[in-house]
């Protein structure tokens, strides 16, 4: 406390101008805190030293008593800022902007009339009531678009509403186009080659074949084919004298794809291969077994075994 008073006296002697608050830098310093080593104004001193219980115990020295309020001079206790509320504004801006009225109207319109229908919604399709006869050409319509209507711009730039299609009239017009197309093809062909199907009078008639001559040629062809027919009775008689080339025992298919004798050779080769594999395996197994027993006999003298097939020779000789 004595050191603080000495520093204040030196400060008052050396510096004539009042010192600014080190926290807000706007007002003159009224208090000096030795614990914080800071010069504070009256407002900053209240905010700093009422923060917690430890800060209230800091010893402070008043620099100019004439700037202190009457409450402080009278010895009234300072209430904590934490109980009365913050006096300073928050450092970070708390912007609470409400939505504009136009934006709210747009949101309400979107909710009432959605452009994209929700999947599974009841308002997705609008089916008008009609008789059973009219249900054949019924197409689901979206409710929002039926109210608004379809607008298409033509080549002049103006907007015109499209008419509802009548499918029966459209089908009739398509049929008319189809038949008119055939008639146009016929007329175009007739105009392109007007004399195609007509015979010129200047031509010779020697090259023309009459119908009677054609029929005579066809009959001659039938007679020639009849001459080349097979005599089935003679073929059957010659077939009975000879044996059938097919072998019923070795016939593996109805078409005799595999010649006789090949299947027997295949079975024989498979059996020989199995026998060869068995003998090779048996020989290897016996050889391995013989080696194993020989190794046990050699190691019988090194390992003392009282039971078993192989006993040490020294024990056998002693007994």
From Swiss-Prot:
It holds the Pfam family zf-B_box. Belongs to the CONSTANS family. It comes from the Eukaryota. Residues 271-313 form the CCT domain. This is Zinc finger protein CONSTANS-LIKE 8. Disulfide bonds: none annotated. GO terms for molecular function: zinc ion binding. InterPro entries: CCT_domain, CONSTANS-like_Bbox1, CONSTANS-like_ZF, Znf_B-box. The gene is COL8. Its main location: nucleus. The keyword Zinc applies. Zn(2+) binds at residues 21, 24, 44, 49.
């Amino acid at each position: 406390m004595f050191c603080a008073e000495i520093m204040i006296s030196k400060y008052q002697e050396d510096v004539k101008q009042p010192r600014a608050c080190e926290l807000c830098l706007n007002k003159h310093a009224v208090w000096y805190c030795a614990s914080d080593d800071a010069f504070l104004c009256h407002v900053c001193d209240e905010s700093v030293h009422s923060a917690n219980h430890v800060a209230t115990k800091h010893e402070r020295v008043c620099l100019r008593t004439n700037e202190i309020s009457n409450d402080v001079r009278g010895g009234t206790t300072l209430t904590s800022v934490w109980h009365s509320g913050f006096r300073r504004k928050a450092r970070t801006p708390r912007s609470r902007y409400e939505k504009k009225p136009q934006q709210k109207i747009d949101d309400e319109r979107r909710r009432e009339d959605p452009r994209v229908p929700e999947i599974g919604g009841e308002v997705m399709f609008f089916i008008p009531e009609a008789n059973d006869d009219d249900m054949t050409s019924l197409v689901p319509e979206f409710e929002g678009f039926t109210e608004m209507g379809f607008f298409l711009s033509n080549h002049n730039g103006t907007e015109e509403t499209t008419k509802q299609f009548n499918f029966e009239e459209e089908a009739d017009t398509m049929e008319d186009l189809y038949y008119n197309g055939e008639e146009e093809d016929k007329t175009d062909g007739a105009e392109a080659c007007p004399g195609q199907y007509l015979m010129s009078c200047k031509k010779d008639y020697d090259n023309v074949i009459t119908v009677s001559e054609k029929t005579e040629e066809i009959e001659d062809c039938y007679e020639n084919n009849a001459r080349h027919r097979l005599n089935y009775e003679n073929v059957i008689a010659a077939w009975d004298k000879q044996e059938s080339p097919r072998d019923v025992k070795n016939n593996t298919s109805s078409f005799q794809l595999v010649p006789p004798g090949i299947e027997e050779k295949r079975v024989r080769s498979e059996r020989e291969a199995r026998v060869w594999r068995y003998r090779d395996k048996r020989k290897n197994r016996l050889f391995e077994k013989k080696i194993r027993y020989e190794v046990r006999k050699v190691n019988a003298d090194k390992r003392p075994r009282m039971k078993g097939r192989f006993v040490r020779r020294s024990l056998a000789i002693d007994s």
